[in-house]
């Protein structure tokens, strides 16, 4: 084994120490202290004898705490001296590292932390900077910025992947996945544990494609929600999802019935399949497994490629950038421009009559409309023949009193 310092910090070593760090008797207490130090409270408030006693600290979101915990564990690991690192039988207690955090007495400089982090694994410049910020806030150190001229190996790798992604034709990928769902996955049963991930992935994928919702919002829809979407073309119902304050409604309007009908068909046979923990990575794992099952090869598969596909088609078919931005709930069109044409969406001139819409990744309101007879040229996304697309039907649904009127939905062109 090579004992050069550059090989001391690796995944095997980290996994061993990660367990010991998390099991330390002071872990929870010091993690809470460290987390609290990430708050940016203005000095004029913090040092004011009157207002400081009334300060209210807004709780961190679960996802933020999850990120902080990951950084905290890596920080403690990087504080361990090299001499103790690979001596697994040593009685090193980690008290030195934890106490340095409490007392704000740095054991290493920020630059050394960078070196040790890069020794552990290849990370992006952004990830490394976030870890450094976490450290300097924790230890009350001056701000440390990685030089602008720096491009780390992981950044170069991602840049190459993004360049390759421009040649990926999303239309072909979507058709391939839908074909796999139609011919194979919809016939599977959740009675077999091994098949459950594929079934979940198929249902959520079809909902995303039919509504433009993000993956974590798609999995919250019920069979009743799908029935309403398919029957009326839209749904207004509070489903307990976070939305921006200026939104006054929580509307879900169906664009394309075919994917939703396919989702419903599978969902009805497996009604409890989406009952999974709220804060879980399961939907993303299911999505990747779905792509693998369909023999779709991508360097960096991401569920939001569907939203890229929808929004790019809206823009390419002539919708003004500002309107696409508004529908995606972006603060500025610059944010939306970042979404557009990152992939080859596979547009052709025969698709100009399609109707569709998209939703923002930070909002749960989907404004999608599927007018009766809308033509979508894609085999698996088109030919909705149910005849239930009328949004004027007001009977036989659990959400009769919550259905939004047609005049509050935008009609969108889509490929």
UniProtKB/Swiss-Prot annotation:
Summary of the function given for this chain in its UniProt record: Involved in very late gene activation.
This protein's record includes keyword Heme: no
Feature: compositional bias, Acidic residues: 346-363
Gene behind the chain: VLF-1
Organism taxonomic ancestry: Viruses, Viruses incertae sedis, Naldaviricetes, Lefavirales, Baculoviridae
Gene3D superfamilies per the UniProt record, alphabetical: Intergrase catalytic core (1.10.443.10)
Protein name per the record: Very late expression factor 1
Bias (Low complexity): 375-404
Family: Belongs to the 'phage' integrase family.
Positions of region (Disordered): 339-415
UniProt keywords, alphabetically: DNA recombination, Transcription, Transcription regulation
């Amino acid at each position: 084994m090579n004992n050069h310092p550059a090989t001391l910090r690796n995944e095997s070593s980290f996994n061993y120490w990660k367990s010991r760090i998390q099991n330390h008797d002071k872990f929870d207490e010091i993690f809470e202290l460290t987390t609290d130090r990430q708050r940016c409270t203005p000095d004029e408030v913090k040092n004011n004898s009157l207002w400081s006693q009334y300060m209210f600290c807004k709780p961190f979101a679960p996802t933020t705490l999850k990120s902080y915990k990951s950084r905290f564990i890596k920080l403690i690991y990087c504080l361990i001296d090299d001499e103790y690192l690979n001596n697994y039988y040593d009685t090193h207690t980690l008290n030195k590292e934890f106490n340095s955090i409490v007392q704000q007495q740095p054991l290493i400089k920020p630059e050394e932390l960078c070196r040790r982090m890069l020794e552990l694994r290849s990370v992006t410049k952004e990830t490394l900077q976030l870890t450094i910020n976490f450290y300097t806030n924790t230890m009350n150190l001056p701000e440390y910025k990685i030089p602008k001229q720096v491009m780390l190996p992981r950044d170069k790798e991602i840049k190459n992947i993004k360049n390759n992604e421009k040649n990926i034709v999303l239309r072909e990928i979507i058709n391939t996945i839908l074909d796999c769902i139609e011919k194979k996955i919809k016939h599977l049963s959740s009675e077999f544990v091994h098949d459950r991930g594929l079934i979940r992935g198929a249902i959520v994928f079809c909902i995303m494609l039919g509504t433009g919702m993000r993956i974590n919002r798609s999995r919250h829809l019920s069979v009743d929600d799908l029935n309403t979407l398919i029957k009326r073309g839209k749904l207004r119902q509070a489903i307990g999802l976070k939305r921006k304050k200026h939104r006054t409604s929580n509307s879900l309007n169906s664009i394309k019935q075919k994917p939703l009908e396919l989702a419903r068909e599978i969902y009805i046979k497996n009604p409890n399949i989406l009952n999974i923990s709220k804060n879980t990575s399961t939907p993303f794992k299911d999505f990747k497994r779905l792509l693998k099952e369909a023999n779709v090869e991508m360097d960096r598969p991401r569920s939001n490629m569907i939203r890229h596909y929808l929004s790019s088609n809206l823009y390419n078919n002539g919708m003004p950038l500002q309107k696409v931005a508004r529908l995606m709930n972006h603060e500025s069109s610059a944010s939306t421009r970042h979404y557009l044409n990152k992939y080859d969406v596979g547009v052709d001139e025969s698709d100009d009559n399609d109707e569709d819409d998209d939703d923002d990744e930070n909002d749960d309101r989907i404004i999608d409309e599927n007018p009766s007879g809308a033509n979508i040229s894609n085999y698996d996304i088109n030919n909705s023949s149910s005849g239930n697309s009328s949004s004027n039907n007001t009977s036989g649904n659990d959400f009769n009193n919550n259905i939004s009127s047609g005049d509050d939905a935008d009609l969108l062109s889509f490929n």
